Amino acid sequence: MSITPAKKSELISEYKVKDGDTGSAYVQCAILSERIRNLTEHLKVHKKDFHCRRGLMVLVCKRRKGLQYVRNKYGNDAYLDLVKRLGIRDVFH
C-alpha cells in the first residue's frame, strides 16, 4: 500500500522543479497520486477494508488541496499541465 523508496525517488526526479527539490507541490501531488493508485488497487481486492477507504479519502483531499495550491500559486496552465502529467481528472473545471 505504501510506495517503495525507489519509486518515490523516481517520482521526485520526474516532477522536481529544480535540483534538490523534494517537497514542492508538484512532487507532493505526484507522490500522493501514486499512493492513491496503490490504495485503489488494494480496495478492489479488499472491498470491506473501511479503515483503508477512509485513509484513501484523506489522501484524495490532501491531493485536491495541493492541486488547488498549484492552480492558485502558479496559474491555471501549470495546474492543467500537472493534471495531464499525473493522468487524473480536472477537479476544478
Curated annotation (Swiss-Prot):
Xref: SUPFAM superfamilies: S15/NS1 RNA-binding domain
UniProt cross-references to Gene3D superfamilies, sorted A to Z:
S15/NS1, RNA-binding (1.10.287.10)
Q: Name one GO molecular function term.
A: rRNA binding
Q: Which GO terms describe its cellular component?
A: cytosolic small ribosomal subunit
GO BP terms: translation
Any Pfam family:
Ribosomal_S15
Query: Would the keyword ATP-binding be found if you checked this record's keyword annotation?
Result: no
What keywords tag this UniProt record?
Ribonucleoprotein, Ribosomal protein, RNA-binding, rRNA-binding
Keyword Ribosomal protein assigned to the entry: answer is yes
Cross-referenced InterPro entries: Ribosomal_uS15, Ribosomal_uS15_bac-type, uS15_NS1_RNA-bd_sf
Function per UniProt = One of the primary rRNA binding proteins, it binds directly to 16S rRNA where it helps nucleate assembly of the platform of the 30S subunit by binding and bridging several RNA helices of the 16S rRNA.
Q: Which family does it belong to?
A: Belongs to the universal ribosomal protein uS15 family.
How is the subunit organization of this protein annotated in UniProt? Part of the 30S ribosomal subunit. Forms a bridge to the 50S subunit in the 70S ribosome, contacting the 23S rRNA.
Name under which the protein is recorded = Small ribosomal subunit protein uS15
Q: Which gene encodes it?
A: rpsO
